[in-house]
């Protein structure tokens, strides 16, 4: 299996989370898994080359990204119904509820994505980061000293929380600035049908890919939308520079 490294990374994260919560506070294992799953969702969305190599293709990274996002919602809903309001401050509970409402709303928007403009959908999708921050406030306000004193649990939760925050910050504020190392020029543009275009691009340096994978392209020419869009890749003339 070519994506074994990526799958081992996901499985190891969940196993470590389960073992840590089971040995310290087993009653909070569900929200603990939700936090790890959310952090993994942000990490997978960074499109880092390392992750792409681990999963053997960006399309496989996004398949797992969708899985962890869906799993996060299921865990959060289950947590909300099974433990909501049992303990903790009113403000902490409000942060948690607000985070869940935002997550669910964005999931609904995702299903309506094909009916709204991509740029609008992309900005709405970024609200997930705000919900994640609300969720972290909820967790740390609820757990108190358990997560503020150094131990295995606080190290695990803090590590994944920090990775999730850094990943989200990178996606929203840094991705379009420091990414896109491959420059190219469009050499041919062909309309295949009413909603499909074939674009041939000559790159400034070789780019290894396989037919059927996809990549994000950004158009720098003035007058065009600057947001990166995903495009399917075809092995045109079996060249890696076009």
Regions found by a protein language model. Name each.
Residues 2-168, 183:
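Membrane-embedded alpha-helical bundles of multi-pass integral membrane proteins
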Residues 167-179:
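Short boundary/loop segments of OB/S1/cold-shock single-stranded nucleic-acid-binding domains
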């Amino acid at each position: 299996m070519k994506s074994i490294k990526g799958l081992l990374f996901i499985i190891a994260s969940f196993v470590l989370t389960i073992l840590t919560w089971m040995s310290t506070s087993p009653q909070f294992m569900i929200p603990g898994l939700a936090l790890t799953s959310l952090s993994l969702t942000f990490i997978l969305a960074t499109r880092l080359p390392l992750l792409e190599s681990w999963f053997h293709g960006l399309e496989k990274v996004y398949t797992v990204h969708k899985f962890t996002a869906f799993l996060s919602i299921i865990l959060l809903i289950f947590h909300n119904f099974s433990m909501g309001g049992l303990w903790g401050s009113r403000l902490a509970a409000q942060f948690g509820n607000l985070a869940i409402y935002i997550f669910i709303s964005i999931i609904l928007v995702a299903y309506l994505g094909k009916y709204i403009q991509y740029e609008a959908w992309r900005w709405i999708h970024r609200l997930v980061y705000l919900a994640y921050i609300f969720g972290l406030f909820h967790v740390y306000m609820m757990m108190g000293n358990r997560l503020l004193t150094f131990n295995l649990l606080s190290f695990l939760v803090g590590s994944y929380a920090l990775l999730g925050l850094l990943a989200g910050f990178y996606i929203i504020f840094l991705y379009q600035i420091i990414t896109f190392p491959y420059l190219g020029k469009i050499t041919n543009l062909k309309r295949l049908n009413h909603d499909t275009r074939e674009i041939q691009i000559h790159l400034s340096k070789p780019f290894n890919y396989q037919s059927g994978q996809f990549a994000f392209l950004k158009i720098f020419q003035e007058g065009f939308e600057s947001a990166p869009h995903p495009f399917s890749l075809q092995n045109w003339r079996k060249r890696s520079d076009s």
